[in-house]
C-alpha cells in the first residue's frame, strides 16, 4: 500500500471545495481509487461507474455536494468472483486490505419489486493522516445483476493532480439521464435527501440541460426490469412523505459546497412539477 501524507492532503485541498480536511482526504482517496480501477485493463472492460461521486465529480463538476463512496455496475461477462478479486487487487495499493467484503441481495427500487439485485459491498477503513480522529471509511459497491444498461456507457476522461503529476484515466460512466433515472429510483428506495438534491441540481444546473423525458424513460426501464408497478400518484404521495421527514430534509446540511443555498421543499416542488408529473398515471 502506498499511503497518503498530510502534505498530499493539503495540496489536494486547493482543488476541492470541502471545508474539512477529513473530507479532503477522503476525496483524494476516492480520486486515486477511481483512476486505479479504470486504469486496470481487466476492470476497464467489465465495470462502469454511476452514483453521486460520478454525478458531481464528473458530470456536474465542480461538485456541489460531498460524496463518500464509489458505485459500480458490472457490464462485462466475467464471473462475479473474478470482479471481486480484481477490485481488491487493484485497490490494495491505494486503500490496503478491506475490512469487509461481502455479497448481498437488495431490492433496488419499489417496495413491490420482485427481482432483487446482487451487490458486492467492500469497505475499507483507514486512519486519517491529515488530522487525528476517527477512521475514514471508503465504500465500494458493485451491482452484478444490472449488466445491461438502458443507454450506451460513455468513456469519460478524468484527472486530478497528485504529487506534482496529473493522474489520468478514462472511466466508463453511465449516461447522465440514465444515472438520474437511477437517482429517481433511489429517491423512492431509501430516505436520503441527497437523492432529491441530485435530481434538483441536475435539472436546474446541468449544461447542456438534462431532458426530463429521457430521465423518466430510464427510470421506467429499471422499474420494468425489476417487476415493479406503481402509478404517478403513488410516487407523488411518497415524495410528500419524504418531505415531512426531518432527517430526510436535513441530510444535505453537512454535504453542500460552501455558498450553496438549498431548500428541500422548493426542490421537491420542482422535481414533482418537472419530473414526477411526466410519469404515467
Model-flagged regions — what are they?
Residues 49-54:
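Glycine-rich beta-strand-to-loop/alpha-helix junction loops that act as flexible
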